[in-house]
């Protein structure tokens, strides 16, 4: 433990809190271009083929982002908008792709929670 004299000379530094989605640079969303679209498997207790895309952002960073919902139309060179938010069972996936924006189509035949998946109101 430091002495009072040491604390006077060099006071305690507050801990710096880092953002969980640093590559967005304090923006709510960022635009990017898909460089690779593929599926990956989740961590131990779960089993699935999760759809993810590697995205090069406008600020130059490359991030892995999750494609939510059933079916998608993304391929290489698709322009997408990403938001923060990790996927708990996919290590390294800290971003989500927004559906129904730019080149990404909304989820077809979606009836509940439509706004989260960019789906229009069914007639």
From Swiss-Prot:
Residues 9-21 have a biased composition (Basic residues). GO terms for molecular function: rRNA binding; structural constituent of ribosome; tRNA binding. Signal peptide: none annotated. Residues 1-30 are annotated as: Disordered. Keywords: Methylation, Ribonucleoprotein, Ribosomal protein, RNA-binding, rRNA-binding, tRNA-binding. It comes from the Bacteria. InterPro entries: NA-bd_OB-fold (IPR012340), Ribosomal_uS12 (IPR006032), Ribosomal_uS12_bac (IPR005679). SUPFAM superfamilies: Nucleic acid-binding proteins (SSF50249). CDD domains: Ribosomal_S12 (cd03368). One of its GO terms (biological process) is translation. GO terms for cellular component: small ribosomal subunit. The modification 3-methylthioaspartic acid is found at residue 89. HAMAP family: Ribosomal_uS12_B. With S4 and S5 plays an important role in translational accuracy. Part of the 30S ribosomal subunit. Contacts proteins S8 and S17. May interact with IF1 in the 30S initiation complex. Belongs to the universal ribosomal protein uS12 family. This is Small ribosomal subunit protein uS12.
